[in-house]
Amino acid sequence: DSVNIGILANKASTARELLARLSTAYENLPKWMQQGILVWNKGNIELENGSKILASSTSASAVRGMSFNILFLDEFAFVPNHVADSFFASVYPTITSGKSTKVIIVSTPHGMNHFYRMWHDAERNKNEYIPTEVHWSEVPGRDVVWKEQTIANTSEEQFRVEFECLGGDTEIEILDDNGIVQKTSMENLYERL
């Protein structure tokens, strides 16, 4: 059976880089597992069994009219909100038409946007997405020494944003001990804890 995969990212160059990594993995398969190749370039791969992989930037028209078994969306929180909204409006009919279609969304959080709504709705079981978090400390080779070196090479703020997923200027609402809703930044909340 053939499989159609869409790799979409906030920038076309990022999607092409992901396709290049997948291409390298394919090249390292034993020859007997590799299918014949019909198309092999920076933007797509097509195999003789009919399977296709497309790499593109996320936009409303990027995959319109196409059908996919797997749709991989990278750094989706960095796709402008109006683009993310129109993208899902145009692609959702395709997603729901397949019985086994999978949508995989990967991102570092980036403010309160389409990704934020999807994530928080998933946490509250308001949609069918399954939120999965991978903390930096779960990645082999990343320990306290790695953290300290990374902070020394960048900054504590950058580490919190990129690895702890805490944006210092991200505004949130919290309920204080008196039941009063207050707006605060993630940085202020982080310092309070």
Labelled PLM ranges:
Residues 172:
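GGW-centered surface loops in extracellular recognition modules
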